[in-house]
Amino acid sequence: VAVAVIDPVAIENKLSTQEFPEILKSTPSIYATKQGGGFGDSRVNVRGFESENVAVMVNGVPMNEMESGKIYWSNWAGLSDVTRSMQVQRGLGAAKVAAPSVGGSINIVTNTTDVKAGGGISYAVGNDGFNKIAFNVSTGLRNGWAISILGAKSWGNGYVQGTEFEAYSYFGNVSKQINDKHMISLTVLGAPQWHNQRNDNLLISEWQKHANKYKFNAVYGFGLNGQRKVAGYNKFHKPQISLNHYWTINEKSSLSTALYVSIGRGGGYRGQGNSTYKNSWYATALDGTLNTQFRAADGTFDYAAIYDLNMKSENGSQMAMSNNINNHEWYGLLSTYTTQLGQYFNVYGGLDLRYYKGTHKAVLVDLYGGDYYVDSESRKNVKAENNALAQDANWKNEKLKVGDVVYRNYDGFVTQEGVFGQVEFNRNALATFIAGSVSNTMYWRYDRFYYDKAHAKSGKADFWSGTVKGGANYNLDEHNNVFANIGFISKAPFFEYAVFLNKENSNELNKDAVNEKIFSVELGYGFRSPVFTANLNLYRTAWMDKSMGASVTFQDSDERGRINMTGVDALHQGVELEVMVKPVRNLELTGMLSLADWRCNSRATGYLYNDQGIPLTKDGVVTTEKSKEHAKVDVDLKDVKVGNSAQTTFAFGANYQVLKGLRLGADYTHWARNYAKFKLQGSDLSKELGKTMKYDTPWKIPSAGSMDVNMSYRFPLGKVWGIISANVNNVLDQE
């Protein structure tokens, strides 16, 4: 298995003020970035696959949000302080859960009974007002009990305009070794935070027009009387509580069970506007240029002009701000049984159960000087056959105040039940395994905005999925080994992208939704010695029936449409090399090279439906399904490069212990062949209905590299130890 393990020393020495995933940026085929630059807004891609296709776990418990598969790292800001190890498997991997991952898995293992007694306090200061204070204390294992506690606070201004943040993190673990057969462990962790964001997607030429360049935030500006305003804002708290039981049944068998719950509360801002101003909150036009409609002379967003517009209006606020609330409740059970059969076989089997409810609504938080807001743009799309209020003119033109609901109010439900198993054979130089899983995922909605109580609950969609994979490793001698893995994955589509015609406003199921299929093959070679280590991996992953779609609007009709594409396929293949050399005592040199070819390789087809699942012509008129008049579009994606992740990366680093306690380090990472992420746009598809649309490879981002340097000094302070560390990230000032 292609695997990397990050230990606490590496995290302490190299992470500094970076986002937690950025500790992985020198790992082959991993692309970690800050995205817009707001606190916790980072993401990590593995072998070209985005976070929804990378399984992220804490102590083996899955963390990916169940409606979209996404990971929001701001929810886990404090994990770096209590991480015992961060295990990253690229490719098929060996994660013991029923739901499969495509790109790989990241498992963060936290402290438990093996933590030594002691504790510490720390303070960190960095650029742009960054501050962090933290403490931790552990009792070690005493009389069968072990307790670990951590608390931290981070705050700062952010290096991007107007991206202030304040974050707390906490971790608590109480473990009890009942006897030599049973141990229980209760873990509580969370990271409440708020932060301002930057979410625009400007062309490089647009960034370069501004004096602040890459610190520029297009939604940062000033309101009446000069008060600072930022349209991008996020606040969230997602505590997780897990109760683990470890049972050593006998010398050959054990049972590990985790019962967990996660309750998320929070959301983020989204601008609202009437028909004239509904797109005015977007800082970037579709062509990547700056939206200048509400732009002050100095380039900042002109909130004062919005106040002026609303206060002069006789019809309430023309533009307003809502908070998109995304609360959830998640309950799960994960249990794994392990036993040894005979001398050479190990068998694993388990159960993975999950229940998830997400509550999604939007409430007004700022009228920007107006007396009220009329949500006519959304309410005009409510159909009388779904909600009797659609015939009530007073409801359609209701004067809404702060706290009232706009544009959406629904619950998303996901349940998953699965089993998994694995058999391993180990004898002499040969180790083999075969593994499989089967799971059923069910989705449904309950809508309170577009549907009345009689029609609020949607039908249920369930998808059976599974995996079959196997592999072998052979040690040629004490230094050399080779391995191979092969696997097939059938994966349920996500609630957010494909199951419903429109996840925000429609209970109609997408008739064309099917499982995504993945076939993957890996080959590897490894060499180990006291002074030199090398790993070489080759992989090829075919991704079939990828979920993709877009919404469509019509100029001469209030009807809204949705096109869900079928037959979207992609191929991810590449080679990875990593080496480590210890040429002299106290000096360690590392290097990495990753060369990839990730591209789409199919022609996809999509038909046009409205939010009620009724087929439409290209003019938005109701027609017969799959008839000649039923509007469709063919999209030729052949050889379009997969974007959002560098397809060529290399890195090298050095770590030298100058003298006892003093260590210096430097790491350089280079990214090339990184293409912009392409996305099907409804405005483009609507122009090509009835035709074949050819997508070209998106813009290739210029190659770039970044060097980070670090230093740490560990010294005695009486009976305790002190550590001073310093980091300079991007020391070469690469833009």
PLM-predicted stretches and their roles:
Residues 189, 227, 484, 519, ...:
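Conserved C-terminal beta-signal and adjacent last beta-strands/turns
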Residues 21-62, 78, 84:
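Extracytoplasmic beta-strand/coil segments of soluble accessory domains associated
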Residues 62-90, 109:
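Short acidic/polar hinge/loop motifs at secondary-structure boundaries
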Residues 346-480, 502, 605:
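Signature of Gram-negative outer-membrane beta-barrel scaffolds
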Residues 200-202, 442-449, 460, 474-520, ...:
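Surface-exposed extracellular loop regions of Gram-negative outer-membrane beta-barrel proteins
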Residues 175, 183-246, 269-322, 386-400, ...:
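Acidic/polar loop-and-plug regions of large Gram-negative outer-membrane beta-barrel proteins
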Residues 125-155, 160-198, 240-250, 471:
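Transmembrane beta-barrel wall of Gram-negative outer-membrane proteins
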